[in-house]
Amino acid sequence: MVEFHRSPDGVALHGREGLWLPYPVEYKKGSDKTQEADEVQLCAQALCLEEMLCCTIPEGSLFYGEPRRRTRVVLDESLRARTLSLLAELLENQARGHTPSVRAHKGCNACSLKDVCVPRLSRTGSVHAYMHARIAEDSP
């Protein structure tokens, strides 16, 4: 979600007076995590907004449903560099046609993509068997 806060450093919004600075808020079902994946996701969203709206977004928030609390995230140079580094790695893998192997872990059950997860799908057998099963599901 993106909130817009009135700011002299903001951008003009159609139908609104004044200048408004985008403030990305990423909602998460569970609680805060020790790894930085949520912060990187928020930063990637902010980078996209910055490019689309020609502005600089200094911070955003993560809202965790478990404690029902927002956590402020400063989008500093270190986080931006980490996010851009991961993006470069992703693009390199895509260009090579390479999908990195991933192991299932305890956080997988809370993931919104668990039903289409590559580690889980790869345990079901070959691509041919998977496609055959999906086609069979759609057949009358």
Question: Where in this protein do the model-derived segments appear?
Answer:
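Metal-dependent nuclease catalytic regions and adjoining charged, substrate-binding loops involved
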Residues: 50-140
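Short, charged, amphipathic alpha-helix that recurs within catalytic cores of restriction-modification
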Residues: 38-51
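Short, solvent-exposed loop/turn segments at secondary-structure junctions
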Residues: 32-33, 70
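Short alpha-helix boundary/capping segments
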Residues: 33-41, 75
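Well-ordered beta-strand positions in beta-sheet-rich domains
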Residues: 22-24, 39, 70-72
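Conserved catalytic cores of phosphodiester-cleaving nucleases, focusing on short active-site segments
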Residues: 1-32, 44-47, 111
